[in-house]
Structures are given as C-alpha cells and as structure tokens.
C-alpha cells in the first residue's frame, strides 16, 4: 500500500515542496537505493526522478505499542524543480523502467520484450542509446533509462 500512495503523491503535481513520511525501513532503503544494489528497483528510479530523497532517522519497533516486527524509517523527499534527466516522453521513460525491472535476472534486451517491441527494434534502440543490452536493468542509472526511452521516442516519431 505504501508504494501506490507515494507514487500517487509524486505524480499528482500538487504544489508541495517536500514529502516527509514514515515507512518500513526496507521501503525507505528501496527509495534511496543506488544502481547495482539489491534494493534498487523501479521505486528507486521513480522517487529519485521526482525527488531528492534521504533517510532522516530510523524508528525502532519499541517506539510503538504494540511493537511491530519491523523497524520504520522517516524519509524526506524534496521535490525537484525539474527531473535530473531530460526525457522526451515521461510515460515512455517509465515504461522502459518498468520493463527493466520486470524480470530481474534477465538481461535488459530480454526484459524489453515485455514492451511488445521486436528483437530487431530493441537492438536498434539499444544501439542508438549506446547501451549494452546484455546488462541487467538493475545496473542502469536514471540517465541510461532516459537514453533508452529517448532513443525509442526518436524511433517512433
């Protein structure tokens, strides 16, 4: 339930400057995760696209009655004036991100098949973006996801 609420707030275009929430520590770690780490995923990319997140503090289970089985974290997300990467089509960007994490153990070229693109088209856009399709999506930076999305946008113009 946490992820849909956070994403709804981030995508809402409400006039907010920052979002401060308490979430399970594992969710907070996913929100601030860097490429190539086990916690890095689509949530990391989305939160970091819209905000500059940082974990403010951890809240131990004993702080609550009854005590939950997990540690919580307070995370501050300062909304960006503009995303850190230039994207031609934001929906296409998030479609590429979703594909990149659809099957974590597969190569990016294989996970891109979930978009409905042909193998030849995938190879074409990866070449245009100068991306090695044999890498896994969880190693991609925001810029690399943007490069693939922008290459795709250019191919469908």
Segments from the language model and where they lie:
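Class I S-adenosyl-L-methionine
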Residues: 1-137, 147-157
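Interdomain hinge/lid region at the active-site interface
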Residues: 144
């Amino acid at each position: 339930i946490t992820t849909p609420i956070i994403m709804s707030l981030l995508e809402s275009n409400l006039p907010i400057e920052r979002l401060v929430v308490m979430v399970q520590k594992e969710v907070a770690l996913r929100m601030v995760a860097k490429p190539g780490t086990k916690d890095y995923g689509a949530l990391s990319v989305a939160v970091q696209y819209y905000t500059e997140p940082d974990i403010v503090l951890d809240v131990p289970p004993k702080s609550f009655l009854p005590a939950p089985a997990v540690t919580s974290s307070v995370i501050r997300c300062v909304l960006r004036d503009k995303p850190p990467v230039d994207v031609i089509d934001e929906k296409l960007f998030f479609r590429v991100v979703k594909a990149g994490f659809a099957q974590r153990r597969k190569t990016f070229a294989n996970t891109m098949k979930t978009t409905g693109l042909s193998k030849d088209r995938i190879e074409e856009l990866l070449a245009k973006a100068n991306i090695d399709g044999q890498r896994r999506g969880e190693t991609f930076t925001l810029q690399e996801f943007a490069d693939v999305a922008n290459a795709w946008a250019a191919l469908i113009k």
